[in-house]
């Protein structure tokens, strides 16, 4: 029977000093011996997805205490990728994931907490906390802040739903007036919550449901809706029950590594492929799997992408649907339900809230179940009022979206495509693979070739796009922006958005060893591995080289013969210390980022730390 970890600091005469300090935090005599539950909150006023979280940690804490636990809250950092986008701030986004994971580990282990509630929401916060939970392997429950409501605006007499990406594209579209751009800006992000499309934040919060670590509705129930409060309260009750099952009943099935095992990672990736989630999820799932000792790789993602269909298209893949529409159609559980009916998921996986995923689907899938709580939960609708306050409205849809032929979520027979919404491509340009969000690619350019237009920074590519130097048919190639080369593997939302605004979104490709925002659509291929800074072929491409892309056959090829590539490699390596470095880039890299670059691995491995290098040092 495992002992409560917290007894290290709460029991025995020699721990009088530690108990004195615990008493100074508010603990009473009767609290020593109860499970101490750490609440990792990520409240910040910098991020709209987190501005409403300030009091929610204490909401969970009170519920923990009612259930017989002791709650102790702490906070992590949180970077807003949208605000950090398009300038040097983006260098810090991915590295912040590791800082978050470390900070959660530090706080939980330093204070010997028994269990963990993770209050996350936006892009790197959920992955960082997930990595920490897998690393710590103590009972854990995830509860996110919830999605933002979609914006609503009237442009040229027509009412449209919109999101952040629409505002970015409109800002550089010469056809849009200043007044219309201002209307987009003021309407794109109307409430608190994670941006309203199937971007990285919402994708990751959906995946925590599929992994079995979050409650039904976590990924799709709006931040503003009163029903979301119950998820926070339930998380507080649940974590105490899980802690007691582990420490008092020796039930290891409640631990993150027992729940989020290989089968659960397959379920999560299958969900991601089916819903056309952000390409960043590949990076984060690979990282979390490594933290938990799960042998889940790019090869597994490639295999799943060939058999799981695309059942859901949400912004940015289509302007028609946002997260509030996914929720009305039954959320993550209903997408998993459709995959279940096709035999494409593992039903027997455990979850924090149900004995198995199959049992959860039978209860919460609105197509198969008449469970009143499920029917009610998925009727939660947007309020349509700008606010930064959580749980501030109680609007309900008049009906659920059960149309699996033409609705937001499709069944297998009516899938958008038999191949899923994400694909792994291989070839001489990406020997270890690269990722494309096929759900956002126009069918006319699934097979594409063109001359490489070469850039060694995101900034240079943006200048060329806005300067009308990119032509239809070009392949914009941005290199030295990978985990080591950037460093930090910048997101390329602005280049892809500007291509769209210039009318080039369906006639050009963009390839990079960097990554893309969840808001990216178009023929955008990222995570090229090995990256240029690691000696990848992408570092040998020259201006005008022909690049061939064949998504149906999962192929990406640099049309340069092997002898020429070998000669280029010899010339590169002759540069000694200047080899595999950008030639004409002036970028200040801080000591913190240099340390990140020194330890990080390839995107094909999730850009986690290189344990081999650590072991050698």
Curated annotation (Swiss-Prot):
One term under GO cellular component: cytosol
Matches recorded under SUPFAM superfamilies: IlvD/EDD N-terminal domain-like, LeuD/IlvD-like
Residues at the active site: 517 (proton acceptor)
Record-listed N6-carboxylysine modification sites: 124
Catalytic reactions of this protein: (2R)-2,3-dihydroxy-3-methylbutanoate = 3-methyl-2-oxobutanoate + H2O; (2R,3R)-2,3-dihydroxy-3-methylpentanoate = (S)-3-methyl-2-oxopentanoate + H2O
HAMAP family cross-referenced by the UniProt entry: IlvD
Subunit text: Homodimer.
Protein name: Dihydroxy-acid dehydratase
Organism: Nitrosococcus oceani (strain ATCC 19707 / BCRC 17464 / JCM 30415 / NCIMB 11848 / C-107)
């Amino acid at each position: 029977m495992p002992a409560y970890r917290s007894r290290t600091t709460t029991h025995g005469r020699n721990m009088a000093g530690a108990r004195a300090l615990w008493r100074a935090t508010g603990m009473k005599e009767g609290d020593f011996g109860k499970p101490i539950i750490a609440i990792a909150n990520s409240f910040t006023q910098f991020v709209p997805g987190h501005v409403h979280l300030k009091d929610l940690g204490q909401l969970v804490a009170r519920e923990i205490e009612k259930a017989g636990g002791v709650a102790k809250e702490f906070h992590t950092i949180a970077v807003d990728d949208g605000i950090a986008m398009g300038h040097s701030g983006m260098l810090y986004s991915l590295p912040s994931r590791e800082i978050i994971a470390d900070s959660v580990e530090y706080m939980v282990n330093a204070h010997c907490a028994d269990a963990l509630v993770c209050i996350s929401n936006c892009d790197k916060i959920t992955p960082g906390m997930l990595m920490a939970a897998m690393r710590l392997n103590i009972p854990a429950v995830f509860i996110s802040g919830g999605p933002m409501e979609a914006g609503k605006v009237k442009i040229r007499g027509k009412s449209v739903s919109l999101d952040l990406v629409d505002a970015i594209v409109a800002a550089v579209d010469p056809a849009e007036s200043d007044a219309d751009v201002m209307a987009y800006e003021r309407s794109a992000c109307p409430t608190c919550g994670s941006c309203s499309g199937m971007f990285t934040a919402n994708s990751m919060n959906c995946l925590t449901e599929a992994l079995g670590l979050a409650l039904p509705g976590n990924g799709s129930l709006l931040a503003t809706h009163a029903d979301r409060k119950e998820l926070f309260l339930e998380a507080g009750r649940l974590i105490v029950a899980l802690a007691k099952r582990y420490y008092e009943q020796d039930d290891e099935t409640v631990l993150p590594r027992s729940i989020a095992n290989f089968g659960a990672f397959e379920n999560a990736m299958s969900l991601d492929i089916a819903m056309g989630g952000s390409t960043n999820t590949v990076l984060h799932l690979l990282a979390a799997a490594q933290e938990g000792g799960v042998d889940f790789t790019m090869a597994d993602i490639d295999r799943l992408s060939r058999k799981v269909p695309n059942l859901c298209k949400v912004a940015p893949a289509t302007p028609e649907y946002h997260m509030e529409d996914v929720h009305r159609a039954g959320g993550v559980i209903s997408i998993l339900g459709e995959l279940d009916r096709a035999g494409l998921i593992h039903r027997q996986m455990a979850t924090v809230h149900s004995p198995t995923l199959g049992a959860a689907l039978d209860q919460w899938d609105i197509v198969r179940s008449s469970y009143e709580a499920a029917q009610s939960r998925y009727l939660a609708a947007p309020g349509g009022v700008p606010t930064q306050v959580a749980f501030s409205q109680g609007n309900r849809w008049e009906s659920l979206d059960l149309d699996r032929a033409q609705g937001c979520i499709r069944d297998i027979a009516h899938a958008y495509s038999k191949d899923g919404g994400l694909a792994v491509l291989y070839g001489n340009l990406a020997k270890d693979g690269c990722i494309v969000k096929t759900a956002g690619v126009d069918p006319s350019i699934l097979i594409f070739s063109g001359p490489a237009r070469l850039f060694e920074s995101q900034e240079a590519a943006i200048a060329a796009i806005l300067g009308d130097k990119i032509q239809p048919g070009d392949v914009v190639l941005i290199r030295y922006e990978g985990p080591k080369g950037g460093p930090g593997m910048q997101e390329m939302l602005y280049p892809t958005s500007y291509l769209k605004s210039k009318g080039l979104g369906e006639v050009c490709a963009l390839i990079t060893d960097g990554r893309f925002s969840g808001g990216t659509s178009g023929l955008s291929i990222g995570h090229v591995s090995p990256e240029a800074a690691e000696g990848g072929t992408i570092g040998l491409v020259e201006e005008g080289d022909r690049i061939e892309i064949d998504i149906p056959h999962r192929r990406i090829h640099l049309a340069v013969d092997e002898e020429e590539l070998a000669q280029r490699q010899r010339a590169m390596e002759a540069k000694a210390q200047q080899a595999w470095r950008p030639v004409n880039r002036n970028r200040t890299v801080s000591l913190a980022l240099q340390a990140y670059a020194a330890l990080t691995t390839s995107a094909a491995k999730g850009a986690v730390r290189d344990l081999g290098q650590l072991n050698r040092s």
